[in-house]
Amino acid sequence: MATAAGATYFQRGSLFWFTVITLSFGYYTWVVFWPQSIPYQNLGPLGPFTQYLVDHHHTLLCNGYWLAWLIHVGESLYAIVLCKHKGITSGRAQLLWFLQTFFFGIASLTILIAYKRKRQKQT
């Protein structure tokens, strides 16, 4: 049986990775939905590369965008299953894991995967 602390276990992920993921997904969203508003010439080497992708592979970018969100949904659902398997029974903790994994994907899920619940010794 899980301890009370284990049943409510939640750990926020790394601010570094959350920032990287947020900026990357934000840029990806901008590229997919508003490519005409991107100042390609001001982005250094990223500008011409992004413009090439938009001009020649926009359908692939769109499909990849929705696939990335679909993967995040799958990771989030797996996080719920993993919570139950690891003895995290608190609805609030499970919701936090679901949301964090939905928005930040593998950066969150790896924390949950690494979690080892402490087993109580039977006397």
UniProtKB/Swiss-Prot annotation:
GO cellular component terms, semicolon-separated: membrane
Modified residues (N-acetylalanine): 2
Subcellular localization: Membrane
Membrane-spanning ranges: 15-35, 61-81, 95-115
Membrane-related topology note: Multi-pass membrane protein
Keyword entries, A-Z: Acetylation, Membrane, Transmembrane, Transmembrane helix
Keyword Acetylation assigned: yes
Record keyword Acetylation present: yes
Pfam family, one: TMEM254
Annotated protein name in UniProt: Transmembrane protein 254
Source organism: Homo sapiens
Gene field: TMEM254
